[in-house]
């Protein structure tokens, strides 16, 4: 109730919509919680999810109780909830997608988004499932599988993604693959290429490489050079030295460029500065942002408090930010919308006019 009154006072007028990311203790009383925000906060629509932790402005609260809230008085469409993302309004300049759980058709739906809405950036996050097996995403107190909110009315969405990886070895063309099994790169066994990439690492990097090696699929095949941020990062699930095969958590295509990657604290810190440059460039036009940060990041990985949130604050200044710790993240890479892991995705709302506010 206090937060609802605070947001109403700060905005000075009714809010079009509010993004709300709450701790698990709110799930049982979700309908009442949203009703209080809507009635006492003068908020038309309340959309968000229950998650493992919240992000409030420049701070991250992993596993904490409470909630973060970002309310907007205009520039966004009416939220759409249901079992799948629906059509966005004509003229939309981006959208936020929040989903509960990952299903086998997730990548196909993202590809369908790119076909139906070319040039409309999509950013978002995935939360888990509730103990009762139901979704943790909600819209106006009702639990739904997906909620989508589009930027419209002169407001645009500027996405950024920090993956925390750097390429190792060399980029090579996939020459043989079957489903998620990678057999050869540049005519060489995929495992042998992985071995060479590993041998190129320093002793310090080799010592912590276990569990931190990934496969990077090029997001843009027409790039002349590849660097951090140019790849869709996929897990390496297994490898067979005898057959030379490497199994990854993605579907490589013959002819696609692939380069192995390493994830480390140092590479992740360096990547943060690069990744949020689009946000920094939009600073003068930005009014607010959402941040979706993987549960595998945060203080436990970086060794510093609120690494993603503080970096975004450095890029945007004291613009209001809300977000949550996610199980997976959604953002475009090289013009292709993709599902990511171990990533921090920022969705910056940049608008010619409008008003926003945030409450803790």
Model-derived features with residue positions:
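Small-residue-enriched flexible segments
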Residues: 1-40, 44, 49-302, 306-319, ...
